[in-house]
Amino acid sequence: MFTINAEVRKEQGKGASRRLRAANKFPAIIYGGKEAPLAVELDHDKVMNMQVKAEFYSEVLTIVVDGKEIKVKAQDVQRHPYKPKLLHIDFVRA
C-alpha cells in the first residue's frame, strides 16, 4: 500500500504549475465519486520512487490531504518527453 502526502493547490494555471515543478513538486488532480475535483501538489522525488513499482498503477493508493485520507487509483500519468520527470497525474477516487 502506498501513502502519498499532498497539499491543496493554492494557485492554478501554467505559470503556477511551472513554479511547482521548479520547486521539485508537480500538480495532480483527484476526481470521481460524488465529491468535487481536488487539485493537489505532490513531492516529485517521493512519487517518482513509488511509481517505479508496477503496483503503483494497479493498487489502491492513499493520498493524505490536510489529515484526511483519500483512497485513489492512478488514472493517467504525464511524463516529460526525455527527462525522467513526472509532469502531472490524474487520480480517480476508488
Swiss-Prot record:
MF annotations from Gene Ontology: 5S rRNA binding; structural constituent of ribosome
InterPro entries associated with the record: Rbsml_bL25/Gln-tRNA_synth_N, Ribosomal_bL25/Gln-tRNA_synth, Ribosomal_bL25_short, Ribosomal_L25_dom, Ribosomal_uL5_bac-type
Domain of life: Bacteria
Listed Pfam families: Ribosomal_L25p (PF01386)
Key word rRNA-binding present: yes
GO cellular component labels: cytosolic large ribosomal subunit
Keyword Membrane: no
Transmembrane segments: none
GO biological process, one term: translation
Keywords of this entry: Ribonucleoprotein, Ribosomal protein, RNA-binding, rRNA-binding
Subunit structure: Part of the 50S ribosomal subunit; part of the 5S rRNA/L5/L18/L25 subcomplex. Contacts the 5S rRNA. Binds to the 5S rRNA independently of L5 and L18.
Family: Belongs to the bacterial ribosomal protein bL25 family.
Functional description taken from the UniProt entry: This is one of the proteins that binds to the 5S RNA in the ribosome where it forms part of the central protuberance.
This protein's name: Large ribosomal subunit protein bL25
Gene name tied to this protein: rplY
